[in-house]
Amino acid sequence: MKKILFVLAAILLLAITVQAKKVKVTIDGRVSPSQTKLYLIINEDTANAQLLPIKDAKFSVTIEVDSKAFVRLHDWKEWPERSAFVLIPDSRHITINWNTGEIEGSELSKKLKKALDEIKQHSPEGFHIDVFSDDPAAWRSAQESGNSMREMMLQEQRMIAKQTILDNRKSFICAWIVYCFPELMKGELEAMLDHMKPKWMNHPILKKKQQKN
């Protein structure tokens, strides 16, 4: 009987240990004067996105969330890759400025924003070579050069994503990077993550994405 009670106590302790810690955080700030909509989405649960009231280009909301949640603020709830702000509740009060992109009160949110900005800066998306000629050969040459340049940029972007993950391997901010840039995770990066088996790969947003796929 004592052995059974001991096992049950151990299971209960484990459940308490792994249970996500809840935190209460106030998020406020300024938005663009013309902005009429602002959604708050927790861990990409867009079905339960919260439409925040805006008054005089300001907003304020207090929420209780998991300490490792990703809180996305945007006027378009279905577009995580282009989010204006992705916040991590590592403090009780976070303030954002929509016009300048500044975040106050959350060092983890700043760290994530910096990592995302660096990866996006090297994106080949939209890159092209202008051709001021009607010569088909010139067009073919430009297309080949453009494809080669885009591939080089993609490889560089992939290397930056890899280094970012290695530098932050124990931080769950990597979960958002993997979520937003799945195309960069193929091949070498995918093999690296399979080998590392980081705990953040069990984050709810990645589990949800795996279920969809």
Language-model features: where?
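Intrinsically disordered, low-complexity regions
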Residues: 1-2, 20, 162, 170, ...
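Amphipathic alpha-helical repeat scaffolds of TPR domains
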Residues: 132-136, 140, 169-180
